[in-house]
From Swiss-Prot:
This protein's name: ATP-dependent Clp protease proteolytic subunit
Family designation: Belongs to the peptidase S14 family.
InterPro entries referenced in this protein's UniProt entry, alphabetically: ClpP (IPR001907), ClpP/crotonase-like_dom_sf (IPR029045), ClpP/TepA (IPR023562), ClpP_His_AS (IPR033135), ClpP_Ser_AS (IPR018215)
Protein's UniProt keywords contain Plastid: yes
Keywords, alphabetical: Chloroplast, Hydrolase, Plastid, Protease, Serine protease
Gene name of the encoded protein: clpP
A GO CC term attached to the entry: chloroplast stroma
Subunit structure: Component of the chloroplastic Clp protease core complex.
Recorded GO MF terms: ATP-dependent peptidase activity; ATPase binding; serine-type endopeptidase activity
PANTHER family from the UniProt entry: ATP-DEPENDENT CLP PROTEASE PROTEOLYTIC SUBUNIT, CHLOROPLASTIC ATP-DEPENDENT CLP PROTEASE PROTEOLYTIC SUBUNIT 1
Gene Ontology biological process terms in this record: protein quality control for misfolded or incompletely synthesized proteins
Main location: plastid
Length: 196
C-alpha cells in the first residue's frame, strides 16, 4: 500500500499551532529544491516557478538544487539552467545518485565553487539526441539543423563552466561519458566531492 508523500509539521512564524505539509513543501520553504526525475516541461516549470518565487521572497539567501535525474528534454533543461543564471541568489547544485544528460547540464550550471556531488554519485555527459527517427526527410533535416545548434550551445556552456577547451568538451560529448564524483570534479563539472 503506497504511503504517498510523507507529511511533516510546519509552524509559520507567529503561529502557535503547526500544520502538516508534505515534506517537499517544507523543504522548499528552507530553499531546498529537488530534481528527482526526467527533465520535462512540467518539472521545469515547477522548478523555475520556485526559483523565481524564492528569489523574489529573499534575494540574499542561496538556493540548493538536489539532482538525481537521468536527463530528459533539452529545452526544458536549458530553461532551468537559464533561470539559475537569472535569479539573484546563488544556486548550489548537489548531485546525489545520478546527473545524466540534461541533469549534468543543470549540475554544471550551479554557482561556480558551489557545485557538489556525493562520493558515490555518477555524472554522464553526451550530445543531445533526436526523438524523431521516423520523420519525413524534410522534417528530419530541419530537426538535424536544430540539433546542431543545440549541441553548439551546450558545448559552449560546458566549456565556459568547466574551463575545458571546446574541442575537449565536443570530443567528450560524442558518446556517453560516465564519471565518478572525483572524475567529474577533475573535469570541472563540480567543484567539490562531499566527504563521507
Amino acid at each position: 500500500m503506497p504511503i504517498g508523500v510523507p507529511k511533516v509539521p510546519f509552524r509559520s512564524p507567529g503561529e502557535e499551532d503547526a500544520s502538516w505539509v508534505d515534506v517537499y513543501n517544507r523543504l522548499y520553504r528552507e530553499r531546498l529544491l529537488f530534481l528527482g526525475q526526467e527533465v520535462d516541461s512540467e518539472i521545469s516549470n515547477q522548478l523555475i516557478g520556485l526559483m523565481v518565487y524564492l528569489s523574489i521572497e529573499d534575494d540574499t539567501k542561496d538556493l540548493y538544487l538536489f539532482i538525481n535525474s537521468p536527463g530528459g528534454w533539452v529545452i526544458p533543461g536549458v530553461a532551468i539552467y537559464d533561470t539559475m543564471q537569472f535569479v539573484r541568489p546563488d544556486v548550489h547544485t548537489i548531485c546525489m545518485g545520478l546527473a545524466a544528460s540534461m541533469g549534468s547540464f543543470i549540475l554544471v550550471g550551479g554557482e561556480i565553487t558551489k557545485r557538489l556531488a556525493f562520493p558515490h554519485a555518477r555524472v554522464m555527459i553526451h550530445q543531445p539526441a533526436s526523438s524523431f527517427y521516423e520523420a519525413q526527410t524534410g522534417e528530419f533535416l530541419l530537426e538535424a539543423e536544430e540539433l546542431l545548434k543545440l549541441r553548439e550551445t551546450l558545448t559552449k556552456v560546458y566549456g565556459q563552466r568547466t574551463g575545458k577547451p571546446l574541442w575537449v568538451v565536443s570530443e567528450d560529448m560524442e558518446r556517453d561519458v560516465f564519471m565518478s564524483a572525483t572524475e567529474a570534479q577533475a573535469h570541472g563539472i563540480i567543484d567539490l566531492v562531499a566527504v563521507e
